[in-house]
Amino acid sequence: MPTNLARAAALLAASATLLAACGGSDNNSNSNTTPQIAVGTSAKLALLETTDLHQNILGYDYYKLKDDPSVGLDRTATLIAAARAQNVNTMLFDAGDIIQGTVLGDYQALVSKVACTDKLAIFKAMDKLGFDAGAIGNHEFNYGLAYLGQVTNRQFNVKNLPAPASQAKCQGPAYAQVLANVVSTLDGKPIFQPYVLLDRTIAATAPDGSSVKVPIKVGVIGFTPPTIMSWDKGNLEGNVTTTGLKETAQQYVPEMKAKGADIVVAISHGGPDNAAYSPTMENGNLHLAQVPGIDVLLMGHMHQVFRTPRARSLPSTSPASTRPPARSRACRR
């Protein structure tokens, strides 16, 4: 997926790869000087994605109490390692539905609640793998906003929680979590940071064949299905509301570009639906993909292999329909 670097005449080829385990901050390294990059310099950046981990840390069925080789972040870790070995430059993202889905998730949320001073088990594993950023899935809201705020170390400004300044700062994941289309009813602002700009240095090849290092700023924006307002009405009604994927992207993507994003990655916990667009639709990614400025779209939620015969009959989800969609693997709900 070639795109022109905003700050240099380099070409970046970004290949998106989806790895599904199935069931913090900006991390920026800013510099006051930008090195000159020769015209024709090229690089390849592999974007790796997990989705719908659902607290499947190990390949284990907690109900049957036996190993299950079809699931597990431990198994996906080997795929991540292999992809990193094959590509000099990689970034790792997650598309949400992380904290709920197994007995372990319920145990840490409902039976023996994870302490504020401890990190959720799945986040410990993900931090070991070195994720760069991730979105928020619909199942993140299943245990309520207080619990979600605790395990992600977010002090939500919502009606039914204490003022943010009074909320404890707890252990959350080390990577940036982004969500643009869920906003507080108190101030109309997103309850998570809507996007993050990540400064990275990647290996590239100069026109003369020599190896060089070039800076790149990767913008990452997150979305979740607006239908959470029905699915988790008891936890969300009166506290938050949602905005449509297209409208939200049209608001923030130009802002990300204006701040210097060379590439904009949209992580949307949803799938492609060729129905007419609605701001409340569950799987609005065919429409999201058409928003100008989005270079990469990473999806999840549907627990299906993306390029099925039915999916191939849909319009392209590649931004501006100019790039082939990545082959992806998802899993059962």
Language-model features: locations:
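C-terminal motif of bacterial Sec signal peptides marking the signal peptidase cleavage site
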Residues: L18-A21
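Acidic, metal/ion-coordinating pockets
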Residues: N32-R333
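Composition-driven, intrinsically disordered low-complexity tracts enriched in small residues
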Residues: N28-N30
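Alpha-helical transmembrane segments
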Residues: L12-A16
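Bacterial signal peptide processing site
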Residues: G23-D26
